[in-house]
Amino acid sequence: MKKIVITGGLGYIGTELCKIYSGYSWNDKITVIDNRFISERVNQIRNWNMTFIQGDILDKDLINEHCKDADIVHHLAGITDVPRVKSESTFEKEELIRKVAEEGTQNILDAISNECKIIMPSSHVVYEGLDSIKKNIKEDEKTCPSLAY
């Protein structure tokens, strides 16, 4: 039996990932962590025999408790209400985005074992500082985000 943790599991990608894992949830222990509570999604997660924990990745004790013996962590948690351009940003918003991205991720890295697989997807936003529009960006392309996200 594998222990799988999904942070940010109530977001779009997290919900889709839970759907994929729903066929395996009777054989593996799957824990979904999110700081939000969306009744419909939480009920579906529970119907799939997954455990839902309402909590924040900034809570080091909570993350340690649920990630310390995980086999796989899908780290999807992050601030999604991000400014589109720098003029829409504030220091407080940038600081929260940074704190969740850096400290929250560090909490997970500190909690997991060396044998644990961690999957951390990204988005096109890391390429937003390019000089021109590019199609077919490759994985080894230099990133140059201009916003905190």
Give residue spans per PLM region.
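Residues at the starts of beta-strands that form the adenosine-phosphate
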Residues: 3, 28-29, 117
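N-terminal Rossmann NAD(P)H-binding glycine-rich loop of SDR-like oxidoreductase domains
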Residues: 3-24
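SDR active-site strand-loop-helix element
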Residues: 7, 33, 73-77, 118-124
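Conserved glycine-rich Rossmann-like NAD(P)H-binding loop of the short-chain dehydrogenase/reductase
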Residues: 26-39
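Acidic helix N-cap motif at the loop->helix transition within catalytic regions
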Residues: 39-45
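NAD(P)H-binding glycine-rich loop region in Rossmannoid oxidoreductase-like domains
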Residues: 50, 57-100, 128
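Active-site Tyr-X1-5-Lys
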Residues: 146-149
